[in-house]
UniProtKB/Swiss-Prot annotation:
Disulfide bonds: none annotated. It catalyses: a lipid X + a UDP-2-N,3-O-bis[(3R)-3-hydroxyacyl]-alpha-D-glucosamine = a lipid A disaccharide + UDP + H(+). The keyword Glycosyltransferase applies. This is Lipid-A-disaccharide synthase. Belongs to the LpxB family. The keyword Glycosyltransferase applies. Pathway: Bacterial outer membrane biogenesis; LPS lipid A biosynthesis. It is an enzyme of class 2 (transferase). It holds the Pfam family LpxB. One of its GO terms (biological process) is lipid A biosynthetic process. It comes from Azotobacter vinelandii (strain DJ / ATCC BAA-1303). GO terms for molecular function: lipid-A-disaccharide synthase activity; phospholipid binding. Condensation of UDP-2,3-diacylglucosamine and 2,3-diacylglucosamine-1-phosphate to form lipid A disaccharide, a precursor of lipid A, a phosphorylated glycolipid that anchors the lipopolysaccharide to the outer membrane of the cell. The lineage of its organism: Bacteria, Pseudomonadati, Pseudomonadota, Gammaproteobacteria, Pseudomonadales. It comes from the Bacteria.
Length: 380
């Protein structure tokens, strides 16, 4: 393909901004004559993206939480389709945000523009009929996990498993002692990391639960014990400080500003909200208990739609019940503490499997994704 390659990318939240920026770097390494348009955050803009509007306008979560923003989202998507049809990029890459991106991909593909979707929606878990729209909308699906690629291959959707960028970034072996020294943690203490979520709503549901579980674990565990809690933002720190003000004053807990990777590297075990953070804990080879509580109405709907036996990424990747996972009413302080106790003594079965999974995901994901994108562009 001669001349400047124009690529449109749209990301809807911070994780997509990170993936998009890394992909843009890999594309520029092969094709310096490339131009980026679309929607992205500060990282993608730093790589040269001309963003049509702030990415934060697309960041919304939950089945019912989205309803209040739906008119704006639909309007912005309509504007974006209009602008992209006028700009005629050589290729469109929708990064995650499937409910927003797939509609754009469908319109652009019908207009003769090649389309890629990067990061599979959880179509293998629920709303499986979405695969029909994906087949119509996408020239290529790029997946982070191997079981996703198997799902699409069985349904005749063009797909490439590229691996996960986090598996490339996090080393196969990490230095626990160095991480503890960096956090000024005392030698000889057992360290448990608490990661109750980065969003306000999930922290409101899980924060008090995790704190009460920590209190119960303190009573059950023999020997010195300390908890570390990374705070995703100043707002989340204030939220946690308010929760801790209502608990016992001698609870040995340290709040961190960010530094979640250091907390994972330093700890002996993790109590963690379901989500991407469970993959990070897996890559750091730390035994974990996974918990989650949804908004009641969301859970009432979701429990009838989900088709998989597990909800946590480690179990989905292992294909078995490798880590304890407790959802909704099963996630009680007593149950969480009791599930953590044995992991403080012997968590080896989990961590051996974690190492094998890490190696399977470590594939230089951004380079592979860039190669796949450029192969598709050359066919255009």
């Amino acid at each position: 393909m001669a001349g400047v390659l124009r690529v449109a990318l749209v990301a809807g939240e911070a994780s997509g901004d990170i993936l998009g920026a890394s992909l843009m770097q890999a594309l520029k390494a092969v094709r310096p004559d490339i131009e980026f348009i679309g929607v992205g955050g500060p990282r993608m803009q730093a790589e040269g993206l001309q963003s049509y509007f702030p990415m934060e306008r697309l960041a919304v979560m939950g089945l019912f939480e989205v309803l209040g923003r739906l008119p704006e989202l639909l309007l912005r998507r309509r504007w974006l389709i209009r602008d992209l049809l006028e700009a005629r990029p050589d290729l469109y890459i929708g990064i995650d945000a499937p409910d927003f991106n797939l509609g754009i991909e469908l319109r652009l593909r019908r207009a003769g523009i090649r389309t890629v979707h990067y990061v599979s929606p959880s179509v293998w878990a629920w709303r499986q009929k979405r695969v029909l729209k994906i087949r119509q909308a996408c020239d290529l699906m790029l997946t982070l996990f191997p079981f996703e690629a198997e799902f699409y291959e069985a349904r005749n959707v063009p797909v490439r498993f590229v691996g996960h960028p986090l598996a490339d970034q996090i080393p196969l072996q990490t230095d626990r002692d160095a991480a503890r020294a960096a956090l000024d943690l005392t030698d000889g203490e057992t360290i448990v990391a608490l990661l109750p979520g980065s969003r306000g709503g999930e922290l409101a549901r899980l924060g008090p639960l995790f704190i009460e579980a920590a209190e119960r674990l303190l009573a059950l565990h023999a020997g010195p014990l300390r908890f570390v809690v990374p705070c995703a933002s100043p707002e989340r720190r204030r939220q946690l400080e308010e929760m801790l003000s209502h608990t016992r004053r001698d609870l040995p807990v340290m709040l961190l500003d960010g530094r979640s990777h250091e907390a994972l590297a330093a700890c002996d075990a993790v109590l963690i909200a379901s989500g991407t953070a469970t993959l990070e804990a897996l890559l750091y080879k730390r035994p974990m208990v996974v918990a989650y509580r949804l908004a009641p109405l969301t859970y009432k709907v979701a429990r009838h739609l989900v088709k998989t036996p597990f909800f946590s990424l480690p179990n989905l990747l292992a294909g078995r019940a490798l880590v304890p996972e407790l959802l909704q009413d099963r996630a009680t302080p007593e149950a969480l503490a009791e599930a953590l106790i044995p992991l403080l003594e012997i968590g080896g079965e989990q961590t051996e499997c974690f190492d094998a999974i890490h190696r399977s995901l470590r594939r230089d994901a951004s380079r592979r994704a860039a190669e796949s994108v450029l192969e598709l562009a050359e066919r255009a």
